[in-house]
Amino acid sequence: MSLRENPSAPPARRSRPASVALWAVLAALVVGLTACGTTSDSDSGSASAEAASGAEDGAFPATVATKFGDITVKKRPARVVALGWGDAEAVLSLGGQPVGASDWLAFGGDGVGPWAKGLYKKSPQLIGTLEPEFEKIAALQPDLILDTKSSGDQARYDTLSKIAPTVGVPKGGDQYKISWRQQTEMVATALGVPAKGESLIAETEKKFRDSAAAHPEFKGKTITLGSRTGDGFGAYVHGTGRTDFVERLGFKNNPAVDAKAGASFYIDVSRENLDLLDADLTVMTPIGIPASKISDDPLYRAVPSVKAGRSVVFDDETLSAAFSTDSVFSVAYALEKVVPLFAEPLK
């Protein structure tokens, strides 16, 4: 299966434009929830007060620039639905509590990796990824929807924005092309805590600088970040979370891969052209297949960097997920666990 629809997991069906029937269901649902909302008014008010008390002075109204235009958030939201990949972790890192979230890597439980385990006070309603259940989202009565790291599909955005103000992908952020830094900035602004966001960013950037300083051998080295699914091999292009991670450590993404980049975050690599994966270091992630399907493949083993022993194949799903998720929580985990794996073959 191709990775072009989903950067992390076997793709489901693409999102489709909402039908007239869906609009009718959503409209009826919103009206119904409004009519019977008296029993939860005190809870909602309390949540709003608690949320507002954490906002920074002068933070609202907040404006977030997106591909779909500037989105204005008038007051700090109390009921946030975090749909984009890593959006829920961004909210949690900033002290928020999403009422709904998408589980992009099928972690189960609260839908977050072990680096964010235990941060929810109350488990969120889990929402689909490529095809979010719009009725389920509307039933949560959100006052803000976050979808900063997704496909950037116009129909998806149009449907979500009918439910609540929606912060979609940034300009140039189609197909999951947004870094943890930009995602943190956007979410922090929407939640009214931009200074807290900048503090988290500064802390994370220091961790990158410290890791890079500890491994001067990374500087200037070329690296290929690839994956294999049931459909075949591929490699990630510059501008994605994975490449941002390694570039901050001093690596340079494989120029031969970047030369073939299109609109997607990823290029397919045929078996006849696996030498395209060659670099000073080749790092591979198995998706939906055992790691041995990569490491034992004779054509992969013939790639010069692999043959020379300068390769890493992730065989730990947690490490792979941390490297892929690209949130302030997961990159800290990855810096601790993944960087030593990169260093070993370059000694």
Each language-model region and where it sits:
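Sec-dependent bacterial lipoprotein signal peptides
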Residues: 1-34
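A short, structured surface patch at a secondary-structure boundary
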Residues: 87-136, 149
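Extracytoplasmic ligand-binding site segments that recognize negatively charged/polar headgroups
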Residues: 106-110, 153-155, 170-186, 220-245, ...
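Proline-aspartate-enriched helix->loop->beta-strand connector
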Residues: 141-147, 165, 274, 279-280
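Extracytoplasmic substrate-binding proteins
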Residues: 156, 162-229, 324-347
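Structured C-terminal subdomain patch of bacterial secreted/periplasmic proteins
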Residues: 277-347
